[in-house]
């Protein structure tokens, strides 16, 4: 092999390695992606059982039910549609009815959303961006004007 051929084979091998590394990186990132949905968006979305998503909205009034141990069942709503959610773990201190929440998890085979994390808004003037945008688009939520 001539010197030029060796150099060309090293360059081609390096480019092939970089291409494979880039492809594997994008594949891994695609597997970890978690898309955000409001309850009404789920009627048109094709979410498979077991697919990780983020579900956001307001905790529906009168739906919080404490189960055995640290298991809690509640519904997340955008006032157009509600989704039943179960969560096992310690809820944030600010978790309560009619407050903004983002849950992350997947749907079980029974159609109930099984959350493995729950995020609640941190004060009365803050709403998670995804939830606020979704509720504003549906005309449900308006920002309060601070004085």
Swiss-Prot record:
Q: Does the keyword Transferase apply?
A: no
A Gene Ontology annotation in the biological process aspect, one of them, is:
cytochrome complex assembly
Keyword list (alphabetical) reads: Cell inner membrane, Cell membrane, Cytochrome c-type biogenesis, Heme, Iron, Membrane, Metal-binding, Signal-anchor, Transmembrane, Transmembrane helix
Residues annotated as transmembrane: 8-28
**GO CC aspect terms:** plasma membrane
Q: What ranges are annotated Periplasmic (topological domains)?
A: 29-147
Give one Pfam hit by family name: CcmE
Q: Which SUPFAM superfamilies match?
A: Heme chaperone CcmE
One GO term in the molecular function aspect is: metal ion binding
Tell whether Cell inner membrane is among the UniProt keywords: yes
Binding residues annotated for heme, in chain numbering:
122, 126
Q: Where in or outside the cell?
A: Cell inner membrane
Topology in the lipid bilayer is annotated as: Single-pass type II membrane protein
Q: What is its main location?
A: membrane
InterPro entries in the cross-refs = CcmE (IPR004329), CcmE-like_sf (IPR036127), NA-bd_OB-fold (IPR012340)
Residues assigned to the Cytoplasmic compartment are 1-7
Entry coiled-coil feature ranges: none
* Role: Heme chaperone required for the biogenesis of c-type cytochromes. Transiently binds heme delivered by CcmC and transfers the heme to apo-cytochromes in a process facilitated by CcmF and CcmH.
The cross-references to NCBIfam families, in alphabetical order and at most eight, read: PRK13254.1-1, PRK13254.1-5
What family does this belong to?
A: Belongs to the CcmE/CycJ family.
Kindly give the HAMAP family that the UniProt entry links to this protein. Answer: CcmE
The molecule here is called: Cytochrome c-type biogenesis protein CcmE
Origin organism of this chain? Answer: Mesorhizobium japonicum (strain LMG 29417 / CECT 9101 / MAFF 303099)
Chain's gene name: ccmE
